[in-house]
Amino acid sequence: MDIVEEILKLKEERNAVILAHNYQLPEVQDIADFIGDSLELARKATKVDADVIVFAGVDFMAETAKILNPDKTVLLPSRRATCAMANMLKVEHIIEAKRKYPNAPVVLYVNSTAETKAYADVTVTSANAVKIVSKLDADVVIFGPDKNLAHYVAKMTGKKVIPVPPNGHCYVHQKFTIEDVERAKKLYPNAKLMVHPECIPEVQEKADIIVSTGGMIKNACLHDEWVVFTEREMVYRLKKLYPEKKFYPAREDAICIGMKAITLKHIYESLRDMKYKVEVPRDIAEKARRAIERMLEMS
């Protein structure tokens, strides 16, 4: 059985579209109809002309697609495709922060569960967080769940950003250290460093540019050699888009297990058996949709 051929056949039969995040396995990226970062995928989800969305990403991304497309079938090919950071933020953290800062808007990174998004005034991605927080008429904002992105937003906007929970982080980006920066500069003296804002502040300070994965794609044209401080598969995406340039992963072990839980076999089985259907309770979806749509309007 040629699995790629079978997927394409099923895709046509089901009137399905495959959306994939930049961190997906190369072979999954190759079969996707659209590849992007969280913001690009959220935007794309609102414009999809298909009955079925197969989401090659992690659970919160598939939830966002379902919230924006309540009448479409959204499939997450593997139940193991989950985000540890999104699960760090609980509703109780938000309620507690609101008690202390009753006038502060709640700004949630899209890397959060649908349940917590229902408590957000607006959601953000790493691509638009600074822009959106700058536009808010507030000097203090509650921000979760990534403390490193919260630090970056505070630095760029001059606002007081309260991280919830205090230690929320992405385990992949938390791995990058100053030693990785020094090694990269030694190994690739002509390269510049592109750093994701989920990295720790000390690494951010050494960056030539601090950008989302979508920003990495847009800015790669500025230089011929880059060391990439984000999930390893982003290097595959960049090399494919810019074959004439050189890209190096800052760490070979910067791997998101949740993203790698989806293989071609999972996508094939997902389309064959129409599994696993993503459902979001209506009351939660309606509240979360307001926060997501506000983000899309503001960015």
Curated annotation (Swiss-Prot):
Give, as one word, the top-level EC class.
transferase
- Per UniProt, where does iminosuccinate bind? 21, 38, 109-111, 126, 196-198, 213
Mainly resides where?
cytoplasm
Kindly state which reaction or reactions the protein catalyses: iminosuccinate + dihydroxyacetone phosphate = quinolinate + phosphate + 2 H2O + H(+)
Q: Which UniProt keywords apply?
A: 4Fe-4S, Cytoplasm, Iron, Iron-sulfur, Metal-binding, Pyridine nucleotide biosynthesis, Transferase
Q: What's an example GO cellular component term for this entry?
A: cytoplasm
In short, the EC number is 2.5.1.72
Query: Does the UniProt entry include the keyword Protease?
Result: no
Q: Which cofactor does it need?
A: [4Fe-4S] cluster
Its biological purpose is as follows: Catalyzes the condensation of iminoaspartate with dihydroxyacetone phosphate to form quinolinate.
Q: What is this protein called?
A: Quinolinate synthase
| Organism, scientific name | Pyrococcus abyssi (strain GE5 / Orsay)
